Every structure is written in structure tokens, then in C-alpha cells.
Amino acid sequence: TVKQILSKGLLGHLVEFESTFPRYRNFIKPNTWKETGQDGGGLTYNLGAHVIDQAVQLFGMPEAVFADIATLRKDSKVDDYFIIHLLRPSKAPEVKITLKSSYLMCASEPRFVLHGREGSYVKYGFDPQEAALNEGVLPVTPHWGEEDKSSWGILHTEKGGRIVHEPYPSLPGDYAAFYENIYRHICHGEPLQSDAREVVGVIRLIEAAWESSR
């Protein structure tokens, strides 16, 4: 949805992109690698990988990274907070990119905030696929991945000297498309939508974020 908004130029020249993944878990979850402190554990390697990858897909690799990574929960062995700034991305060097997550975000925050010279877009809530899967709903179910209209993001633009606030339809998500692409790549030679070089790039950015935070 964000990519579509940008491709249509609905906000004019984009100047700021903020992606936040709010979580609230003020205790240490037992029996999970995410809380053990082993390599690959912690919030930055877990959720950080997703928000970094999304930003890179939209704006390209940055020239530099500035980050603050911390452990805020009592007795936590892993990082549970990060704020990462990606500086001068290759596709849009002037865009200010901020990526943020924490396990101590009890109040809701927007998932995406975009500001351009001609408007803004603010989106709360998450892709509904994970919740549906947890409830036992299968991806073959009609209207899979479609978001309720009440969860659509809001476009804030100026029309005729007035600020107008309009819901913008969320495009349906489709986790299965990733695996279908791998199948078609193996069986039919179709190009991968996400190759190993991109994965390595995201890992390097996470490592750079850690280096910046030390």
C-alpha cells in the first residue's frame, strides 16, 4: 500500500518516512530463542530485519546508519528497544527514514507515517494475515489478507485551500506469494523477488546499527 501511494505521487515529493512496530510484553517470555541472548536473538534481529527490509525495498540501501539499541525490561538478556535512522538511501537520498520498535509500547502508535510536500499518510494496525493464521483461517479462504475498512490508513492532503482527511484502501497481503515465487524460480527459472544479496544487505545494516549504538 505504501509503495502504491508513493508510485502515484499522492503526497508529492516525499520528505519523511517512519515505520514503527509497537509491541507490549513487559515480561521475559520463557522457552524462546528470542529471549536467550544467543546470536540472532533480540528485537533488532527479529522485528528489525523486517522494518529494515521494507525500507530498503522502497528507498534502496543507505550510505550510513545511526541507531540507538537498548535493553529496557528488567532482567532481559536481549535488546528490546531500537530506533534506527537510515541516512541518504540510494533511491531517495533526501528522505528522512526512522525505524522504531520496543517491547514496552503499551499505547498504540502508527505503523506508518509518511510526510510529503503535498500531504501525509498515517496508518495504524498490522497486516491481518498473522492474526488470521493464529485463528486457524487458511490462506485459501475468500477475501484472504483483506483489511477491514475501519483499519485503513488516512491520507491528509490539501484541496482548494482545505485539509482533507480520506481513508486510503489497504491492498490485500499475501504471504503465499513469497513461496510461490520460490517454486516458480526453482521449476521455471522465474527471477527471485528477494535474493540472497538483499538478505546479506539487511544483515549488514543490522550489524551497522549495533556498531552505531555501541
List the model feature ranges, each with a label.
Residues 1-75:
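Predominantly a Rossmann-like dinucleotide-binding segment in NAD(P)-dependent oxidoreductases
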Residues 18-19, 66-67, 98-101, 115:
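Short beta-strand segments
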Residues 49, 74, 100-108:
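Glycine-rich phosphate/pyrophosphate-binding beta-alpha loops
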Residues 76-81:
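A short, glycine/Asx- and small/polar-enriched loop/turn
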Residues 84-94, 114-117:
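Active-site beta-strand termini and strand-to-loop segments that position acidic
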Residues 113-193, 197:
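C-terminal glycine/acidic-rich active-site capping loop/insertion
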Residues 205-214:
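Short arginine-rich
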